[in-house]
């Protein structure tokens, strides 16, 4: 079975690079990707995107002029369509140590140019994973959050033994995160059962990778530790062995080298045992092959790499000089970013203008959205006189939020380059307006929960909450008057503020009178109520722009509002997360005629008598029973309304991507990855259960599994016995 595992894209590297080097003693032969030039290109591209062209090569990652690119060596069978993204991400991870840790989806308007570049690179990576594979992308980004949190915790710990250290190091060094990325890139998919079978072998390989990394990076890390007078901690296997076993660093390095060989030997033994089982999985064998490639690739790459030792020439600067800045930009050119292509090609503009048409029906595999980044807000200076008025605002402002509007402001600033002072004013005004609308919405809708917490008016009273909401509108105007006259006219003379109130009024009228609007009427209401604030944001920023002041994104903002509101309607009735935050189908309690309900009540061949009666009852303040809500969900489902709603969302999602590409071209080709990520995160998916990231305790279990077993003579062994047996073999 193992003989059938082929290397489609991998080729062996020249043995002269490593065969005669005494520092290379791996049991495995190294390979490299046939298209390694792509990995080199995107590695340089990542430097340009992150720090600008003048800073290319100021830090070191993938590139190695001696042996080849790290990603090319460790994932030599990576699929061509995923290769560039995988290599770009690994390059960013290499550079990450020199940056402040944060999640892949962090976006802020109040940052330096350097930090803004970092946010844009993170957004590019996140958006591309979500575009290519929503389920894996969701897992992958969550795993990154685990990694960045772990780095802060682990580096302050002490470890009683090397095994305790390795249990943590796998997470600290992002070994599993990196190898899962390589696995996805190589098109390898394991079932949960196959994952469990492979885990002990995976652990041994991950530990070997960490040990080899520690061996080759030791001299550099120790020098940094001494130079900093101990401020830079020593998180390295050599140091752990020296401390726990009372050895010199030289002797500790020899012990670590023996550990590396022991882990490779154990990997081979476990692999042989698995291959001898009945019907070994082809995917598991492909995974084991990838692990072998990664162990060999990491080792040969480490022999002479700028990250660990001085080199005569800078491979990044040499590559840029040879190929130029245009050639290295191979990751997702503009004409490839809209997905899926065929759907866009076949789409008619008339279909997009009327999302209620039957042509909106389609099948797709969308993505469940992540939580948004932490919002940075402009707050009102609270005098003693203001404090009672602001209590409801302070409360609702403190609740968790997806921060879509904050993210939109940060994303649009990539084009408009609004001065910092004006940007903060716009951000603050929008925050006041948004929270004002939330306070009023909760009262008008009769809501009980907001983001999983009691609504403000239940705590502070209806009268006080209404007063706060109207006060916030005045405060928003007060802020906007600090901007240019054109910005003030956007707020006072253009109809967006009127549209917000008129849209909300129509929504309340329909619910109170149980009047079922047409889908087109509903979307018209959404264009005012939700799209109005998005358009207001874009127009305020455009009025203060120092660049692209003629760039009008009103159509994009309108469609974004439609997508946002219809998605919210769908999630309220279908999402487990919404149930946690707002209660189970609370739109039904409120008697709200949301988009899926409107579609269901206009389905031909069905009587609406029962549904109408339920909605009239809810207007009398009756909270619907669980059984009644389940009945209504069954009715809506049977009429195909949820499927049709998803089809509408799919069309809107695709058109938003098309408009984004069109706008990027109008903005001089400036790619807006933060905006692209926002669109991807607002896409909707089935609530699939994705395996949670594996913790260090998980790898502790697999550490014990890896070293428990039988030698060929049938005697039970553990790691210590295995090391002794290997030493005896070498002595013979």
From Swiss-Prot:
Entry binding sites for dimethylallyl diphosphate: 450, 529-530, 565, 572, 582, 592
Motif placement: DDXXD 1: 97-101
Prenyltransferase: region residues: 312-732
Chain sites annotated for binding Mg(2+) 2: 97
Residues reported in the UniProt entry to bind Mg(2+) 4: 441, 445
Motif mapping: DDXXD 2: 441-445
Motif (NSE/DTE): 213-221
Molecular-function GO terms, alphabetical: metal ion binding; prenyltransferase activity; terpene synthase activity
InterPro entries tied to this protein: Isoprenoid_synthase_dom_sf, Polyprenyl_synt, Polyprenyl_synt_CS
Positions bound to Mg(2+) 1: 97
Names of the cofactor(s): Mg(2+)
UniProt-annotated stretches for the region Disordered: 348-370
Region (Terpene cyclase): 1-311
Chain residues that bind substrate: 97, 169-172, 213, 217-221, 307-308
The EC number(s) this enzyme carries: 4.2.3.-, 2.5.1.29
One Pfam family of this chain: Terpene_syn_C_2
Catalytic activities: isopentenyl diphosphate + (2E,6E)-farnesyl diphosphate = (2E,6E,10E)-geranylgeranyl diphosphate + diphosphate
Superkingdom per UniProt: Eukaryota
Binding site for isopentenyl diphosphate: 402, 405, 434, 451
Chain positions recorded as Mg(2+) 3 binding sites: 441, 445
Protein role: Bifunctional terpene synthase; part of the gene cluster that mediates the biosynthesis of conidiogenone, a diterpene known to induce the conidiation. The bifunctional terpene synthase PchDS converts isopentenyl diphosphate (IPP) and dimethylallyl diphosphate (DMAPP) into deoxyconidiogenol. The C-terminal prenyltransferase (PT) domain of PchDS catalyzes formation of GGPP, whereas the N-terminal terpene cyclase (TC) domain catalyzes the cyclization of GGPP into deoxyconidiogenol. The cytochrome P450 monooxygenase PchP450 then catalyzes two rounds of oxidation to furnish conidiogenone.
PANTHER family: GERANYLGERANYL PYROPHOSPHATE SYNTHASE
Entry remark concerning the domains of this protein: The conserved DDXXD motifs as well as the NSE/DTE motif are important for the catalytic activity, presumably through binding to Mg(2+).
Protein name: Conidiogenone synthase
Protein species of origin: Penicillium rubens (strain ATCC 28089 / DSM 1075 / NRRL 1951 / Wisconsin 54-1255) (Penicillium chrysogenum)
Lineage summary: Eukaryota, Fungi, Dikarya, Ascomycota, Pezizomycotina
Recorded name of the encoding gene: PchDS
């Amino acid at each position: 079975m193992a003989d059938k595992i082929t290397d489609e894209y991998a080729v062996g590297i020249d043995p002269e690079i490593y065969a005669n080097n005494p520092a290379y003693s791996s049991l495995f032969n190294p390979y490299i990707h046939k298209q390694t030039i792509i990995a080199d290109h995107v590695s340089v591209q990542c430097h340009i995107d992150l720090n600008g062209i003048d800073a290319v090569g100021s830090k070191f990652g993938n590139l190695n002029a001696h042996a080849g690119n790290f990603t090319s060596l460790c994932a030599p069978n990576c699929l061509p369509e995923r290769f560039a993204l995988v290599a770009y991400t690994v390059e960013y991870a290499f550079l990450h140590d020199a940056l402040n840790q944060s999640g892949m989806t962090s976006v802020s308007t109040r940052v330096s140019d350097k930090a803004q570049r970092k946010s844009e690179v993170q957004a590019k990576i996140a958006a591309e994973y979500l575009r290519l594979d929503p389920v894996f992308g969701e897992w992958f980004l969550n795993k990154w959050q685990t990694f960045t949190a772990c780095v802060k915790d682990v580096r302050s710990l002490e470890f009683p033994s090397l095994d305790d250290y390795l249990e943590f190091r796998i997470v600290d060094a992002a070994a599993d995160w990196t190898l899962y990325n390589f696995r996805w890139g190589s098109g390898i998919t394991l079932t949960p059962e196959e994952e469990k079978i492979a885990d002990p072998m995976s652990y041994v390989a991950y530990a070997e990778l960490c040990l080899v990394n520690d061996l080759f990076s030791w001299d550099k890390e120790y020098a940094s530790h001494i130079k900093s007078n101990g401020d830079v901690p020593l998180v390295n296997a050599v140091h752990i062995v020296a401390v726990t076993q009372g050895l010199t660093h030289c002797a500790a390095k020899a012990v670590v080298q023996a550990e590396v060989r022991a882990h490779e030997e154990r990997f081979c033994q476990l692999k042989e045992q698995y291959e001898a089982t009945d019907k070994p999985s082809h995917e598991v064998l492909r995974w084991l092959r990838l692990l072998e490639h990664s162990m060999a690739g990491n080792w040969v790459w480490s022999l002479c790499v700028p990250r660990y030792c001085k080199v005569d020439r800078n491979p990044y600067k040499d590559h840029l000089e040879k190929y130029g800045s245009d050639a290295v930009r191979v990751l997702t050119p503009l004409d490839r970013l809209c997905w899926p292509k065929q759907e866009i090609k076949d789409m008619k503009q008339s279909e997009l203008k009327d999302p209620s048409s039957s042509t909106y029906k389609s099948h797709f595999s969308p993505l469940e959205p992540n939580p948004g980044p932490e919002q940075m807000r402009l707050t009102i200076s609270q005098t003693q006189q203001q404090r009672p008025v602001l209590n409801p605002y302070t409360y609702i402002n403190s609740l968790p939020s997806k921060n879509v509007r904050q993210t939109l402001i940060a994303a649009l600033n990539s084009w408009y380059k609004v001065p910092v002072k004006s940007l903060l004013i716009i951000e603050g005004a929008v925050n006041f307006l948004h929270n004002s609308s939330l306070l009023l919405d909760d009262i008008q809708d009769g809501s009980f929960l907001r983001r999983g917490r009691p609504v403000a008016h239940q705590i502070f009273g209806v009268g006080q909450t209404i007063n706060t909401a109207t006060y916030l509108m005045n405060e928003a105007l007060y802020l906007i008057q600090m901007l240019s006259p054109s910005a003030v006219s956007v707020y006072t003379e253009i109809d967006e503020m009127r549209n917000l109130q008129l849209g909300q009024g129509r929504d309340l009228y329909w619910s109170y009178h149980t009047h079922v609007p047409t889908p087109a009427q509903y979307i018209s209401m959404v264009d005012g109520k939700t799209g109005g604030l998005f358009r207001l944001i874009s127009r305020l920023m455009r009025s203060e722009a120092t660049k692209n002041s003629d760039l009008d994104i009103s159509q994009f903002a309108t469609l974004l509002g439609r997508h946002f509101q219809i998605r919210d309607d769908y999630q309220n009735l279908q999402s487990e997360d919404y149930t946690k935050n707002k209660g189970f189908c609370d739109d039904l309690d409120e008697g709200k005629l949301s988009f899926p309900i409107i579609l269901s009540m206009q389905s031909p061949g069905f009587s609406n008598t029962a549904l109408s009666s339920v909605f009239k009852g809810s207007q009398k303040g009756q909270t619907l029973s669980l059984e009644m809500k389940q009945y209504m969900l069954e009715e809506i489902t049977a009429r195909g309304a949820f499927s049709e709603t998803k089809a509408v969302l799919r069309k809107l999602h695709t058109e938003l991507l098309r408009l984004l590409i069109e706008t990027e071209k109008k903005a001089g080709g400036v790619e807006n990855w933060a905006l692209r990520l926002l669109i991807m995160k607002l896409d909707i998916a089935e609530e699939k259960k994705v395996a949670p990231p594996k913790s260090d305790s998980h790898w502790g279990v697999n550490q014990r599994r890896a070293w428990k077993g039988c030698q060929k003579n049938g005697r039970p062994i553990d790691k210590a016995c295995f090391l002794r047996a290997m030493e005896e073999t070498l002595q013979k």
